[in-house]
Amino acid sequence: MKKISVIIPIYNASNSIKKCIESIKIQKYKNYEIILVNDGSNDNSEEICLKYQEKNNNIKYIYQKNMGVSEARNNGILNASGDLIYFMDSDDIISPNLFDTIINNFTDDVDCLWFNYKKIYNYDNQWNAEYDVGKIRNTIINTSEFERKVLVEDDGFLWNKVYKLKLIKDKEIFFNKEISVCEDLLFNMEYSKYINNIKKCEYIGYAYFQSTSSSFNKKNNLKWFSILEAYQILESICVKTDIRNFIEYNALYYQCEGYARNKYNTIKFSKNISRVKIYDKKSLKILFSKNISIKKRMKLALFIFFPNLVFRIKQRNIKNKKY
C-alpha cells in the first residue's frame, strides 16, 4: 500500500494548525506521515506541534529559522519517506475520505492526481456530503492540457494535487527559494516536464480557508511583486508555443498591475516597472492571439489603457469580496 507524505509549512499558525492536523488524523486510510516544518514561528506553534509529535509516531517536526515557505517545503521533501507527496497549508482542512480517494485513483500509470477544492470562511460543517470513492468521475489528461489548465484556470496550487516523491527527488524538483508568490505554479510547471499522465478527479477534497483579513492583495504588500519574477522565469524556460502565449498574457497582465501597485505603494518595489504600451510588439501579439479568449484580451486591453483605474476597481472588489 502506498504511503502518503503530507508536508505542512507553518508560520505563526497556532490558531489553525490543530484543525489542519485533526482533519488528517480522521482519515480512514492510515498509511501516511505528517511532516510539520516550522518556519521560525514566534507564537506557540512549536508547542502545539511537539505535543502532536509526542503522541503520534507518524508525525515529524522540523524547526528552521525563518527562510520562507519554499525552503520549508524543500526541507519537508528531503525528510519525506513516502511514495506519494501531498502539500497542505497550515490553515486549511481536507475531506475525511481524501486519502481513500488518492489511493483508489493514483494507479501505477498516473504521474499526478488532481482534484477540486472549495473556499471557506469558517471551519464549521464543511463536509456534509458523503462521497462513494469508487464512483468518482475522473479523466486522464496529458501534460500540455495540464499546463494549459494550470495557467488559464489559475490553478497552479499544490494542495489539490498529489505527486510522486521518487520522481521529485530523482529529478531534483525543488521550490525556488527566491520566489515567495507563485512558487507553487513554478513547481507544477517544472514537475510537468517529467510526466505523461495526469488524472483529474471530479471530487472536492480540500477546503481553502479564505481569510477576510489576508494581506496578500493589499496594495502595500511588497511580496506581491514576486509574481513578476516568477513569470519572468516561466517565460525563460517555456518553449511550447501554445503554453507560452498564456504565460505571456499573464506576465503582461501582472506587469500592468505591478505598475499600478508601485504607484500606490508608499514603499516602492526595488525594480523599475515600466508601463505596458498597447503598440508594443509583445502586447499586439497577445491581444491578437487566437489562443487567448476574447474576454481575456479585452480585460488585458482595459488594464493596458487604464492601469490605475482597473487596479482601484480590483482593490474595491476584493474589499467587498466580489473579485
Where are the predicted features?
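Donor-binding/catalytic cores of nucleotide-activated saccharide
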Residues: 69, 90-198, 206-224
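Membrane-interface aromatic/basic loop that binds lipid-linked glycans or pyrophosphate carriers
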Residues: 266-323
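Short aromatic/hydrophobic "clamp" motif used to bind/position activated sugar donors
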Residues: 85
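Short beta-strand/loop segment that forms part of the nucleotide-sugar
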Residues: 31-40, 60-65, 89-90
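A conserved acidic beta->alpha catalytic loop
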Residues: 23, 38-48
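Short, well-formed alpha-helical segments that are part of the catalytic scaffolds
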Residues: 12-26
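Catalytic core of nucleotide-sugar-dependent glycosyltransferases
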Residues: 203-211, 217-249, 253, 258-283
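Glycine-rich, basic loop-to-helix element that forms the pyrophosphate-binding segment
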Residues: 64-80
